[in-house]
Amino acid sequence: MVNNGPALPPVAPGVLRIIPIGGCEEVGRNMTVFEYGEDIVILDMGVQFPEEDMPGIDYVIPNIKYLAGKERRIRGVIFSHGHLDHIGAAPILLEKLGNPPIIAMPLTLAMIKHRQEDYQKGSSKKLKIITVKSIDDTIALGQFTAKFFQVEHSIMDSMGTILETP
């Protein structure tokens, strides 16, 4: 049995907790949890491709153990762009997290839908989609307000996110 250390205390009132689930000091598996009060917003759900010394492994997904029992508090998952290191784990993790709303630009959403269908036929029908139609859109996610800004990247419809709290 793996000992992950002591459990984190509840988030104190007025405190923003940021938990990088993956993507820190590694390429891939990008996923960050933002927790404020009773609300959780997730940024990205990517896969990581295996190293040469990992035969038989197709990809590595983020460990979402921290979110167990908190599924009803997830107000949405924001996807920054459509590369697999940012959307690749969505077909596996979204269902495990109760299919929370997903937020992204149109191309990114189309890529997520396609990946869902590749994973399990008909599963894209379960997606609760919020389309960022303009970089000027503002979306309320519980106590969070999500705002967006344009970023240059090698794929269209990439966006940065600003999460505001009260």
Where are these regions (language model features)?
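Histidine-centered catalytic micro-motifs
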Residues: 77-87, 150-155
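Metal-dependent phosphodiesterase/nuclease catalytic metal-binding core
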Residues: 33-38, 158-166
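Divalent metal-coordination and catalytic microenvironments
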Residues: 18, 34, 44, 81-82, ...
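Metallo-beta-lactamase
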Residues: 2-5, 10-12, 107-158, 164-165
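N-terminal amphipathic, basic-rich helices that act as targeting or association modules
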Residues: 8-10, 15-24, 28
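Hydrophobic/aromatic beta-strand patches that form the interior of the parallel beta-sheet core
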Residues: 19, 41, 78, 103, ...
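Pre-active-site segment of Zn-dependent metallo-hydrolases
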Residues: 24-29, 36-79, 91-100, 104-108, ...
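A generic local structural motif
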Residues: 5, 60-66, 88-90, 133, ...
